[in-house]
Amino acid sequence: MSIFSGIWIPLVTPFSRGAVDHDALRTLIGAYRAAGVSGFVALGTTGEPAALDEAEQAAVLATTLAAAGDLPVLVGVSGNQTASLRERIAQLNEVPVAGVLISAPYYIRPSQAGLIEHFASLADLSEKPLVIYDIPARTGVRIELDSLLTLAAHPRIQAIKDCSGSPETTLALILDGRLRVLAGNDDEIFTTLCMGGAGAIAASAHVSTERFVALYRALTEGRLDAGRALWHALVPLVGAMFAEPNPGPVKAALAAQGRIENELRAPMTRASDALHLRLKQLAAA
């Protein structure tokens, strides 16, 4: 069975007095392991990698790998120059990550032919499985279904974090069966799992983690009524977690629980006071 299933946590990077708080990161990972998650993403969007220098990124990845134990760790990679990303892939070939999560090149909006060439070039070099991260709202370019089906033929490309917002694309990929489809938009977790998706990479699951794991198990075991009840209870939390730019709300919720400091690096900002109060209430529920 593929490792790319279940509930994965795209970890925040905790800060304390401006520095990465590795102790808080270890504690979070330990709690999520105990809650039954299937894996972790280090240096994904929620982890503020653009705010970290190269040494900090390496240290965060090392801490995550050590704390994750036997659970798999994906590492996020992004950029808009194929050559520089190939250098990063070569570096990661020497690191014991379970795979690499790669988004489309941002800002420059390449053609579909360019996207196929880009991902294939990285997959050819990688010794690790690749998970395509389709998030057009952030990159400015959508990876079309035909392109994804072409890339699915590459043996290194094994899964997709699906933030396309297209239920037609999601279902087509699930029916094709070659890529493991992981929901990337948290408000689509229920529908993706009901369609036969493999799991989710869910920022909201930093809080009420056990409920997200229970939701996954209920739906994959065919217990629809139980899954629906769990999902309905989670909907307010999911909505609040994305009411303002990620990861501000996630960090606010964790800070409300006393698990991390409520710190981000500019230009990202803390959640508003009103949202912080709402998240505190939801996190305590």
Q: What residue ranges belong to the model's regions?
A:
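C-terminal alpha-helical cap/extension of soluble enzyme domains
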Residues: 2-14, 31, 35-37, 194-197, ...
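Active-site beta->alpha loop and helix N-cap motifs at the rims of alpha/beta catalytic domains
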Residues: 2-142, 150
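Short glycine-rich loop/turn motifs that provide flexible caps or phosphate-binding loops at active sites
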Residues: 5, 38, 43-46, 75-78, ...
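Short, flexible micro-motifs
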Residues: 9, 42-50, 79-82, 162, ...
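Poly-acidic low-complexity segments
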Residues: 21-24, 93, 166, 223, ...
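Alpha-helix N-capping/helix-start residues
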Residues: 22, 54, 145, 221-224, ...
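A general structural signal for well-ordered alpha-helical segments in protein cores
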Residues: 25, 57, 61, 85, ...
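Catalytic alpha/beta core domains of metabolic enzymes, predominantly
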Residues: 124-125, 136-242
